[in-house]
């Protein structure tokens, strides 16, 4: 969170909070969903599920996930910020949305639901709070914490999902063999609320909800009634038997004719009789008076406008199902608005990585001139690989402009004349392709990449570094041979002169060692390296001689001192006696030498 500035709290739920934040570098406003730190595994399971689905499925009417990171054992999901929902619209329009706005919203919501269902995904929590509305009027389905893949025959689901007011009767009765129709039921309840401004089945308990379903929608099917009678929760409860009109427009008199037909097709007690999302997009409510042909160009223009502002790239493939988020702040998904141009960013990372690999190669290399051709060869190979990498990168689906054919017929993908091969599970809606590993930033960040990209300046620098290191090695070997020569003390004067000569040699060696160019001085910072190396390699008397040399070099600060120390002590006393005979007669002759 260091890169974000918190602006306030957007919402709070049982699993976490949503904060409005601003990226400090780019100034972009984002929404960060922070999951609570709880001991139970349900929170991590929900977070993992949401990350998995948002990573795998991309659509213009699904909310975009920017990045994921963990901080202080809390999972953070960073989304594009849209601070407006259908619930906010309903609070503003107390009597429901106007018919034109309602139809545009429902068309986009159905496209998102159809995309999920065609990919065998059940959202399981469709409600006005989970429908985001951008400033340009594009709706985005969000909150995939309860979404899951359609179960195989015989498998069961979790029974407690979805908000109660929009929960299908099979969910209320905890029938674990439910499927896609639960989303259609929730959509029908939400359509009535969006059209009238009031929730259709508000309830305080499961029993209260069942009672209202029987009163307003219809009686339970034999299968559901059997589950109800065997449930210990509803033991002793008897539901009323109500006769409902079969005509949808009489059953829902507050809705216009075609919209009442849609709601009646959605709110069927038997899940098998509920209409599918694809059939809903074919309904006369959307196909009459050329609505799709008129709305598609408008939607296309809005998507292009938002694509310029929110040009998302494909996420990195570094998320694992067993390990939801790594304990680091590396984003799972990156946004070029937050981290710069993805192509340039990838090239910079790749160049730095290759430079480090080249440095390791130079350090391990032995010899001088023989290695230079290999480096040049590696350089040429790196350039060819970089060109190949640049040719292999592909733009993301939002970076390119969507063609008219993609938006002309979102219901029938086979009718599109575009040559691009579409996902067979796309269901005909304008979709973004599943995430793959063709993005340039993925290639740049791939740790298994072994490409080397040395440039000419780096090659010259390695040559200089090799020459300097060889010079230092020769200097050290010469000084070691000179310093470790045999020394024999014949007289005090001769021994000191020999030590003085060795000091001069060491000083000259240090001078030669430090006599580099300014560029080389930046590369090497070890003025005491000769003594360290000698101390490790020399043994016995050689180490002692070095210590004696250091001690004597500290004592001899000026060239005048050796002449004083080389004088004989008896001669010194005689000269003092000749100059001060009286002082020496008083017993001060034995002064310390």
Curated annotation (Swiss-Prot):
Residues 468-491, 499-508 have a biased composition (Polar residues). SUPFAM superfamilies: Protein kinase-like (PK-like). It comes from the Eukaryota. Highly expressed in brain, and to a lower extent in heart and testis. Gene3D superfamilies: Phosphorylase Kinase, domain 1, Transferase(Phosphotransferase) domain 1. Its EC number is 2.7.11.22. The modification Phosphothreonine is found at residue 158. It catalyses: L-seryl-[protein] + ATP = O-phospho-L-seryl-[protein] + ADP + H(+); L-threonyl-[protein] + ATP = O-phospho-L-threonyl-[protein] + ADP + H(+). Residues 368-512 are annotated as: Disordered. A motif ([NKR]KIAxRE) lies at residues 45-51. Residues 436-452 have a biased composition (Low complexity). GO terms for biological process: dendrite extension; negative regulation of axon extension; positive regulation of dendrite morphogenesis. InterPro entries: CDK, Kinase-like_dom_sf, Prot_kinase_dom, Protein_kinase_ATP_BS, Ser/Thr_kinase_AS. Residues 368-403 have a biased composition (Basic and acidic residues). The [NKR]KIAxRE motif seems to be a cyclin-binding region. Belongs to the protein kinase superfamily. CMGC Ser/Thr protein kinase family. CDC2/CDKX subfamily. This is Cyclin-dependent kinase-like 3.
